Amino acid sequence: NYKISCVMTTYRRFTCVERSISMFLNQDYIGDTELIIFNTDDEYPLVLGETLSTDGRIKVVNNNIDYNTNKKYDNIGSIRRDAINHASGTHYICWDDDDIFLPWNVRQCVDGIKKYPDMWSWKPEYSSFWRSDGLLEISGNVMEASIISRLDKIREHGFIEHKGGGEHWAWLKVFMDKEKLFVDRNSIPGYCFNWSDQGVMRGHKQSGTMNHPDNFNIHKEGTRDYATRSLEPYSASDLLRIYEKFDTLLKDSIDKTINGYKITQENYNKYVAKIANTSN
């Protein structure tokens, strides 16, 4: 009886949001899911287009007023806290608007929490990193958007409300200290930390100025992909061009060891092998 709440917070990243919606729709998990899009741009609200408006799994919330202070938001932690108020699932995935979620991401995450039901969180040991110079690689990092967590525990431990960022460490530190985050070596990357976008689509990367005392406003000033029309999904061919890069990376990485970790043929066959059919 799992319901997976994919929760996206966003500000002036219109093209990224369209791509991310499409990646949600292309998840191959057969089960209950929802995508909450929490937009804090009060000048350019997000509206689902005709193709998306009939999909009951997708919900857009346009709001720039902190539910606790009744003032405009001044940090991402408060935004994430308010965004999960709209989630109705049992489990939470931070669906970062500018990153890449491969078709098996949710399915593998659910497989993980089923294997380790006493855990509050699960993640694959390795994800991937798409650098700004176009280099795509297997990468190990905390990468909170690669984690699936019990939503009740996320609500209980919350987010750091600080302008510099690092908001996930409020819950993440507790999970790690209590050994309730399972980092699974028997896994395959399903998420990519993406710095490859260029031009207006790239905008500002908050992780690039992490802990700057005014990181929140730097991000707002540097992100200008305005919503000037309704949201529509990416085409199948556009998505497939992205997916094929990862298929090549993962296929070429089978049985190669990275600090004791390796992608097995079994996991490739289980999760990746049908990648060419996910966008039909």
Predicted feature descriptions by range:
Residues 92:
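Short aromatic/hydrophobic "clamp" motif used to bind/position activated sugar donors
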Residues 66-87:
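Glycine-rich, basic loop-to-helix element that forms the pyrophosphate-binding segment
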Residues 162-165, 169-280:
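C-terminal catalytic/acceptor-binding lobe
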Residues 32-43, 61-66:
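Short beta-strand/loop segment that forms part of the nucleotide-sugar
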Residues 106-135:
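Conserved donor NDP-sugar-binding/catalytic core segment of glycosyltransferases
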Residues 2-5, 34, 170:
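Cell-envelope/extracellular polymer assembly enzymes that use nucleotide-activated donors
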Residues 22-32:
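Short, acidic, metal-binding catalytic loop of nucleotide-sugar glycosyltransferases
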Residues 96-100:
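The conserved acidic donor/metal-binding loop of glycosyltransferases
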